[in-house]
Amino acid sequence: MRYQRVELHNHSTESDGEMTAAELMRWAEKEAYGVVALTDHNTCSGHEKAEKIIQEEQLHIQLLKGIEVTTFYGHILALGIEHMIDFTNLDPRAPEKFLGKLRAAGAGAIGLAHPFCIGRPVTAGCRMDLEIHDWNQIDYIEVFNTSGGTEAMAGHIMGNRQALEFWEEKVLEGYHLAAVSGKDIHQKPQKLPVMITYALLEDSGEDQMEGEEKAVLGSVMRQKTIITKGPLLHAWAEKEDLWIEVDHSSEYENWNLKWATCHPVLRIRGKQIEKELPLRFTKSTEKIKIAGVLKEEQEADSQREHTVVLRMYEENCQYENLLAAGISVRWKSGGNEE
């Protein structure tokens, strides 16, 4: 397993951004992103320009094409799509037909941008007011929008805390949804300690063969993403045991230097359990077994599929101490993770 730093929500001067598509790609290269999506409002006109600068200047990033479908009822992110479609017939009370058209037009993953943004009357249309009935039509939720800066600066406006809790509820209901962050870039971002997204990719080389941007799209569809301020981890279940593999190599927020003095706390939440467990990091890369912690979840119903969601905190489980989130573990009784 390897981790790829990605940014999946960005704008250029093709819509309401201040950087051209070329400037955005150069910025992403400088910031060591691996894959960057260009999701201008209701247009794909920047895709060709972004591809051109990547090729001409031999940048090391990959472009993931996309759109932010911008309506008065919410903003829909469509990744993998290469042309805008007509959305004048979008029914906010039954948007599934339109979501199907997005998929048919090439959208590989469909997500909700800043669903709990403050909305009317301050930012009309930014809050998700679509009445979604079939959540199987949605592939991911942007649970941290960091366009307003840190949580202390703009969390009450962007509604990130609500979005994270909503994502967890939907996942525990059984929906297969990935969680991502989004810088929602409109101008060159400041360097602030905000959540970023990593995609978990396979080591086999198969991902590189199909293209890194397609591999990232696949990670979103498989819910193999993590939102983090530094620590990289993935988790899986083996019967009633939870396993976590942590990697402290990320230089984001100097995590590669800070991890040894960290006092992490893992919060595990399922339908039957909610536990807070202190962890101890001893090596730069290690596997940690938490024996028997999933037993109650399994015993509640031995036939069904089980899911837990994880968060990692520093010191205690106060929201402002959140280090990593957006991690789900799904398994069946008597077996391992799906």
For each predicted feature, which ranges?
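A metal-dependent hydrolase metal-coordination microenvironment
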Residues: 1-122, 143-151, 155-162, 166, ...
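C-terminal functional module detector
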Residues: 1-3, 23-24, 174-178, 183-338
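A short helix-to-beta-strand connector/capping loop
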Residues: 57-62, 136-137, 175
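Structural recognition of alpha->loop->beta junctions
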Residues: 128-150, 199-214
